[in-house]
């Protein structure tokens, strides 16, 4: 017959330890936990096969193509220290397997069916190396860090934001009032909560109008450029675009999208619109923990972050290192650099499995948000540096005197930390001292210091 039917060992075809990776290959590092009795080579090869050209049996149509050209290859297997049952499998995928400019297609292949594969107990995608040839097919962030600073005329410090709470239930006018007070007090941005879309108590068009009014009023009074992340996420792409278009007509600087619940296709569409129309795009990562929280299954957030930089977004939530949500410092800083920098060296201590060259794709500002308040300011300034957005929701609106004084307290604390850093002081060592000193000159900050001095989220 010319072809040998039957089930075959994956490792005969897909495990190639002597393969030299090409500059154009997409490389993946998987943490594999095979079922008992499945050898690492077979499991690694199975992952490569199922996420590229393979199927469970030999098919005669294999003869109509060149498998060697199109197959994924497991080219290296390394043990995981302290874990008998796990190992890291490195897989190389030829560039031709993927549609240009489609994060959706990339993920459908690499993290598609293979995650339900019976021979594996669990599978986690730890990192991806995106080759420059593939990166160049993406537009990436609509504007990037430098353009954003120029548009907003804000330099030399992190930007300040605040999520408007209570997240659900306010009327549009009261919502706009809260926005105005925060911006008037000294914040750069306020934010729609990720679950604020267009509900019965507040339809999107009303919210957009009142928020725009708040922005213009605050700008006129402070002489600073202000923004509010208007959440354009919707049930259909058409509705999402309608909201983005209305935001542009109002002349506001920034809109927002929930990229995981909204989906990468919708996100890339919105990002293209934002670049063409001068809107900044703030990205919220609702649902990420469903995908990235388990240590042995799913995918690490650094992969979702890389995917977002390709799909497009100017801000993305990236954990705080200090607040109420999870995140280890070195690992977090690893993917924060992957978002901001142009070239990132492989560094396993920070969870970075591959050297990544973004070939001047614009950078994304990491957003620290979730359970942070004025006492965290020195640590945040030190950890995240200037190119970041620090978001205090409850840490602004929870101020005993109201929203505007809460905003004042945060702005004073931030300016004090930036000044101390510029004078060469050690923020890590003198953190509380810097805040205490500043609070002598700012009753708003003093009140904030008093109310949050005991708060800790430690479990």
From Swiss-Prot:
The disulfide bond which can form in the large chain dimeric partners within the hexadecamer appears to be associated with oxidative stress and protein turnover. GO terms for molecular function: magnesium ion binding; monooxygenase activity; ribulose-bisphosphate carboxylase activity. The modification N6,N6,N6-trimethyllysine is found at residue 4. One of its GO terms (cellular component) is chloroplast. Belongs to the RuBisCO large chain family. Type I subfamily. NCBIfam families: PRK04208.1. This is Ribulose bisphosphate carboxylase large chain.
